[in-house]
Amino acid sequence: MAARLLRGSLRFLGGHCAARPLPALRCSHSGGEERLETPSAKNLTDIGIRRIFSSEHDIFRKSIRKFFQEEVIPHHSEWEKAGEVSREVWEKAGKQGLLGVNIAEHLGGIGGDLYYAAVVWEEQAYSNCSGPGFSVHSGIVMSYITNYGSEEQIKHFIPQMTAGKCIGAIAMTELGAGSDLQGIKTNAKKDGSDWILNGSKVFISNGWLSDVVIVVAVTNHEAPSPARGISLFLVENGMKGFIKGRKLHKMGLKAQDTAELFFEDVRLPASALLGEENKGFYYIMKELPQERLLIADMAVSASEFMFEETRNYVKQRKAFGKTVAHLQTVQHKLAELKTHICVTRAFVDNCLQLHEAKRLDSATACMAKYWASELQNSVAYDCVQLHGGWGYMWEYPIAKAYVDARVQPIYGGTNEIMKELIAREIVFDK
């Protein structure tokens, strides 16, 4: 696996690591002076050493950074206007090995560990390009299929998904059920060996481009509790009665397609059931820690990006005859931001280590998601303020980062719910 990663990364870089100069980066890592630094900030994460990455991860990171520089950043403004990215970039991502990096090689992945996946979503955050829904596709949808799918389902979907030819989405949220998944109304009723699916979903990331959607539906209205009567189904694009509504116009994440989905008497074969009947809520609870960790890592990475943008801006912006960076209030604010970001990075890295060791519990994942997403919004607010009026202009990267940040405390479970779950772990005995 390591040799394949190395060959693939060097091939994308044009045959050798130094094929094209990348931004000068200087933060500390373990393993030697030639290690690739992680964020774009000059000395942002010199909190010691990010020990979770090896030199192989760094080579992989270099190729992923180059991919975003060449295949995503130049097109992102166009995608924002369209409200979706091109399918072409999905297939290019598949060829580069960005999709399902921790999937086994015989299924089209590269057999990497969690840290390879983290490299991909961190580099997307550093690119400030939120359009491609790679993290939902790889970190959430593919995880459900590989963990709970049958051998036939895995063989049918995963190779196409790692190639970027089949785009995945997951449909949980409804008009009357967001964080309260037990309140969903979408239902599936048996008809012989088939299922008949009815209902609707909203705010579905990758919904418009999706080829397969994991749909959360009620399958047993007589269950002792709603949680015991929920199942998951794999619904494919083109099935009769599966209708994609409009692309939703959002405050941020403008290039990421988000859609309404409708299911009107969709006939599903028995093979569309993902996992066991009525076990859907259990599966969701098992997968949510990874989703929340993903959000947390992208949040702190976005914070690192915003800090670097702002640090560079205040060092060249002049006011009162000197650069803004020479004002004590600005210096103190930068000191606060850097400290908060570095502390959060250390916590999130620890959570990544816990998850790789299969020891990340729900409450800790909730803490990471809650804290990092709140930090991201705080950093976004302060960085726009330090940009002054220019921070309110869309052509400045900080403006886009600001509106993209706002949804982070909402999806993956609102931060209010995160606090409830954390408190429950503290107060009540299991």
From Swiss-Prot:
Q: Which cofactor does it need?
A: FAD
Q: Which positions in this protein are listed as binding FAD?
A: 170-179, 203-205, 317, 328, 385-389, 414-416
The transit peptide of this chain lies at 1-30
Q: Give the reaction(s) catalysed.
A: a long-chain 2,3-saturated fatty acyl-CoA + oxidized [electron-transfer flavoprotein] + H(+) = a long-chain (2E)-enoyl-CoA + reduced [electron-transfer flavoprotein]; hexanoyl-CoA + oxidized [electron-transfer flavoprotein] + H(+) = (2E)-hexenoyl-CoA + reduced [electron-transfer flavoprotein]; octanoyl-CoA + oxidized [electron-transfer flavoprotein] + H(+) = (2E)-octenoyl-CoA + reduced [electron-transfer flavoprotein]; decanoyl-CoA + oxidized [electron-transfer flavoprotein] + H(+) = (2E)-decenoyl-CoA + reduced [electron-transfer flavoprotein]
- Residue positions, PTM Phosphoserine: S54, S55, S362
What are the cysteine partners in each disulfide bond?
none
**Chain's role:** Long-chain specific acyl-CoA dehydrogenase is one of the acyl-CoA dehydrogenases that catalyze the first step of mitochondrial fatty acid beta-oxidation, an aerobic process breaking down fatty acids into acetyl-CoA and allowing the production of energy from fats.
| Listed name of the protein | Long-chain specific acyl-CoA dehydrogenase, mitochondrial
Annotated organism of origin: Macaca fascicularis (Crab-eating macaque)
Q: What is the lineage of its organism?
A: Eukaryota, Metazoa, Chordata, Craniata, Vertebrata
